[in-house]
């Protein structure tokens, strides 16, 4: 049984008219005869088409509001992304609403329910299951999702290209004992790629070369001493994100470990904060302006009535290695 949501194209096909005519008829616009309008309305009932209120807003000139859902505003990645998304949305005459889910699951659901009632579409780093219920029927774009298991529009992050470039750079620089500090159990996709690339390059992967820590500055500070204790011979470390990596720079300094002379450090995200520390942080960076543009384009595709709000659309965001002083 086909359970996908009907689109404006389905109405046009059944009514035997153009998309434009369906739009004008359903929005009670002029230059559509009463007979045609009735035929379009009847076709909409047949296919169970429910007009998207945001799409109607686009036609009638009402402002569209997009909700950006983040997990923790203390991570500077999210303010940087919010800034880019706000600019891209404003270029289309849209407004943005920010929703910080916080740490408590119950509170996160309440906040998501609240923002869902205020917006026409949602963009966010949402885990599987978070978009059910409150976001049912709301055009949603998942950032850093997997195209294999997400039933919404997705922008998948191409960590593979960036991590390969980072490890190859470290090897070329004479490093061979490369550790990984992750923030997730079970292993994140970043750690799985790290393992695979090491194996492809003929480097031995050891359990002692991996560590899991909180994805905060404090987590990074603590991880610096811990990884040195369990893997004393390491000469490079790939870190889950820039926030942790900056913390590790501080932790290594406290432990009198010289970066990059003793240990090279590579973060992931490409945050501005990486240029404000000493040594400046080498990072696998995502182009947040390009990410914001892709997200806004996907939202527009979901709002125009041609694509169902729960349609599966996928784009890829490429990450690139930005060389600075830490590696």
Where are these regions (language model features)?
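Flexible loop/turn connectors
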Residues: 225, 230-327
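Alpha-helical recognition/docking segments in bacterial nutrient-uptake
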Residues: 2-3, 65-168, 172
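N-terminal helix-turn-helix DNA-binding module of bacterial transcription factors
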Residues: 1-64
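Hinge/beta->alpha junction and helix N-cap segments in small-molecule ligand-binding domains
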Residues: 53, 71-80, 98-107, 154-165, ...
């Amino acid at each position: 049984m086909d359970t996908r949501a009907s689109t404006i194209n389905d109405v046009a096909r059944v009514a035997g008219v153009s998309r434009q005519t369906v739009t004008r008829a359903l929005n009670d616009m002029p230059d559509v005869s009463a007979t045609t309008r009735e035929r379009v309305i009847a076709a909409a009932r047949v296919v169970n088409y429910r007009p998207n209120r945001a799409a109607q807003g686009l036609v009638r000139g009402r402002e569209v509001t997009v909700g950006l859902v983040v997990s923790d505003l203390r991570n500077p990645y999210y303010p940087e992304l919010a800034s880019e998304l706000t600019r891209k949305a404003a270029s289309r005459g849209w407004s943005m609403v920010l929703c910080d889910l916080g740490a408590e699951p119950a509170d996160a659901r309440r906040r998501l329910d609240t923002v869902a009632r205020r917006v026409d579409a949602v963009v966010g780093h949402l885990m599987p299951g978070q978009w059910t219920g409150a976001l049912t029927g709301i055009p949603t774009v998942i950032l850093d999702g997997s195209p294999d298991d997400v039933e919404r529009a997705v922008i998948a992050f191409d960590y593979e290209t960036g991590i390969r470039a980072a490890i190859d750079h470290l090897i070329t620089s004479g490093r061979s004992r490369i550790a990984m500090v992750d923030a997730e159990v079970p292993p994140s996709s970043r750690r799985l790629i790290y393992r695979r690339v090491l194996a492809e390059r003929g480097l031995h992967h050891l359990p002692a070369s991996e560590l899991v820590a909180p994805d905060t500055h404090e987590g990074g500070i603590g991880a610096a001493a811990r990884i040195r204790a369990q893997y004393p011979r390491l000469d490079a470390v790939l870190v889950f994100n820039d926030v942790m990596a900056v913390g590790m720079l501080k932790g290594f300094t406290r432990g009198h470990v010289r970066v990059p002379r003793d240990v090279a450090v590579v973060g992931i995200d490409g945050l501005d904060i990486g240029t404000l520390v000493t040594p400046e942080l080498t990072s696998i960076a995502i182009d947040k302006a390009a990410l914001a543009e892709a997200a806004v384009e996907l939202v527009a595709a979901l709002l125009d009535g041609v694509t169902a709000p729960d349609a599966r659309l996928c784009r890829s965001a490429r990450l690139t290695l930005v060389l600075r002083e830490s590696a």
